[in-house]
Regions:
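Short hydrophobic/alpha-helical segments at membrane-entry points of transmembrane helices
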Residues: 27, 111-117
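Conserved MFS/SLC helix-loop-helix module at the cytosolic interface between two early adjacent transmembrane helices
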Residues: 72-110
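Membrane-interface helix caps of multi-pass secondary transporters
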Residues: 41-53
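Small-residue-rich segments within alpha-helical transmembrane domains of MFS-like 12-TM solute carriers
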Residues: 35, 39, 121-129, 160
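Helix-loop-helix hairpin linking two adjacent transmembrane segments in secondary transporters
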Residues: 151-176
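Residue-level signature of mid-helix packing/kink "hotspots" within the transmembrane helices
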Residues: 39, 67-75, 160
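Cytoplasmic helix-loop-helix junction between adjacent transmembrane helices
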Residues: 116-154
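Membrane-interface helix termini in secondary transporters
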Residues: 47, 78-79, 168
Length: 176
């Protein structure tokens, strides 16, 4: 048998399904968590306003730091993924985004809080480009449409769930 014939193997449909499920699970989990993190800022803004005596302009600037960092580092996240792998960079970004919120909880002033939001935005910048890429590579043709719809739905679940849980917890626990 020739080397060319050895390279021509019939794809295993069970393996392809497993890859699809794994990619969709990772992408949906990351999207729910990251979008939940992102919308959690809206619950925290009035808390920070009260805690640090901030006006609306300062709150808007803080939100801009988070969103601007998130937006600005999406393309560099793609470059990092090409070098280190999308799943690795996505996992590290998710951890970094969560760490940004931990830092925010330790903030004793506005400058530290803004730095924490920068860290959170930096971590959050990995999700959209890398999770979308995982889905695009795992699903062929029109099958990617349903997968992307599921992925977007998962993000909306995160937007709804994390802020709601945080709002409930703030009733019984301090924000820190």
């Amino acid at each position: 048998m020739s080397a060319a014939a050895d390279d021509m193997q019939v794809p295993n449909p069970d393996s392809a399904k497993s890859t699809e499920r794994r990619a969709l699970g990772v992408a949906c989990g990351a999207h729910a968590l990251h979008d939940g993190y992102t919308d959690l800022v809206y619950i925290l803004l009035p808390v920070w306003q009260n805690e640090f005596g901030l006006g609306f302009a300062a709150l808007g600037l803080m939100r801009t730091v988070f969103s601007g960092t998130l937006a600005s580092f999406q393309i560099p996240a793609g470059f990092l993924a090409e070098r280190f792998g999308a799943v690795t960079v996505l996992a590290l970004g998710t951890a970094l985004a969560g760490f940004g919120y931990v830092l925010a909880g330790f903030s004793n002033g506005v400058a530290f809080l803004v730095a924490a939001l920068f860290v959170g935005g930096l971590g959050a910048s990995t999700q959209h480009p890398l999770a979308s890429s995982l889905i695009a590579h795992a699903f062929a043709g029109s099958r990617s449409l349903k997968a992307l719809g599921t992925y977007n739905f998962a993000g909306d679940i995160g937007k709804m769930t994390l802020p709601a849980v945080a709002a409930f917890l703030f009733i019984v626990l301090p924000w820190r």
